[in-house]
């Protein structure tokens, strides 16, 4: 993946909750979350797995996507992920059946 990319990503936590975030290095950020060094929310919900990621040209765009996603209900979040999977707009997506 390009080093100048900005990503909005969604993690599936061990308790089946979803965590949304921003990063410019997906692999490093996922590793950080699973080492317990990431966000406080994910520390108690490990292990986490990547279930969705989208690439953006700017940090601002990625963070706006994260903000909009966080405003959705759980059902709408799952629909959003499924819609992106079908349209192939996402960099990485697990299907809701894989949650």
UniProtKB/Swiss-Prot annotation:
Residue ranges crossing the lipid bilayer per the database entry: none
The family annotation for this protein states: Belongs to the UPF0213 family.
What is the protein name for this chain?
UPF0213 protein RBAM_000440
A Pfam short name: GIY-YIG
In terms of SUPFAM superfamilies, this protein maps to: GIY-YIG endonuclease (SSF82771)
Q: Where is the GIY-YIG domain?
A: 4-79
What SMART domains has UniProt attached to this entry?
Answer: GIYc
Q: Which InterPro entries match?
A: GIY-YIG_endonuc (IPR000305), GIY-YIG_endonuc_sf (IPR035901), UPF0213_domain (IPR050190)
